Amino acid sequence: MTTRSILGLIYMVQGLKQLGEDPEPVLRQHGLSMDTLDPTTRIERAREMRIYADWAEHLHDPLVGLKMGSFFGLAGYGPLVMLLMTCSTAYEALQTGIRYQRLTYLFGTLRLEPGERLSALVLDPMVMPHKAFRFRVDGEVSGTYKMVRDMQATMGLNLRAEGLDMPYPRPPEAAAYEEHFGCPVRFGEHEARFWLRNEHLQLKLPTFDPNAHAMYRTMCDQQLKAQETTNDTLAERVLTHLGMFNNHFPSAEDVAKSFDMSERSLRRQLSEDGRSFRDLLADARYAKARYLLKNTALPIEDIAAQIGYAESAAFIHAFRRWAGATPREFRER
């Protein structure tokens, strides 16, 4: 399973507290506490995703994700920032950032789409539950923007995007986005896109240093190797991913996209492990149902809805097949 620095989670906790939210109940639910988080340790990517999804369900301010970017400082990116700043041009810095994007705090995937006059830095977001999706997209877009602006300030530059696309419907708070990013923002697109002028990409960076660049590249390569720490099967990773969702679970195609593979490859590899996507979806629903029955007082019909059943009768039938007992009998044991 992929791991990464726990600093991103710590920054999120600090930001949520300063913005008037209370992240501690969700941390406790996951066996964590801000007082005991060690900034030198690492966290499993899937576990961190689950924490963000749980936070999103309890947020009071719909603009929290947008505001979170300001809590991510350059120092938290370690040698990656110096690797980017020692590139020869802005274009090379973008390409290098894309190559080493696993050293950032992103869950989505970055790529660069060249154009005749404008090019786009594209963030393809990871599929997540509805509330978590906007929370994470806003945080990742604003965090990327903050990182680039901070680097520019260090180098004495002041370049801005020509426009920004966001991958969800226009919210009531849309005006806050144009004010935050200082450019037109278009909603309802498939991916997030920063539109950049090509002449800006050819700009020579005043901090270019090939010798230092080689040193920082070696350090970043070592960090990438440290991320792969365990040998969890694909089935285990898919099951963990499905555990993030309530009400509407993602399709096999959506899950495959989250793991950067085709649906066909996903199904084939699961089959080689003796599992199927359908079985894993049932396992995820069963695990969530057990947890809700034992740890909450939610009515049966509400639990049925949370695990994707429109009618409680269908849920009761499925649960009896899984557990050999009805939900009520299981809860009373």
Predicted regions and their residues:
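Short, contiguous, pocket-lining structural segments
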Residues: 18, 43, 132, 136, ...
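Short hinge/gating elements
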Residues: 78-84, 126-130, 202, 224
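Internal, well-ordered alpha-helical segments in soluble enzyme and binding-protein domains
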Residues: 93, 140-143, 212, 234
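DNA-contacting interfaces and partner/effector-binding or oligomerization modules
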Residues: 109, 113-202
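Extended mid-to-C-terminal alpha-helical interaction segments
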Residues: 171-333
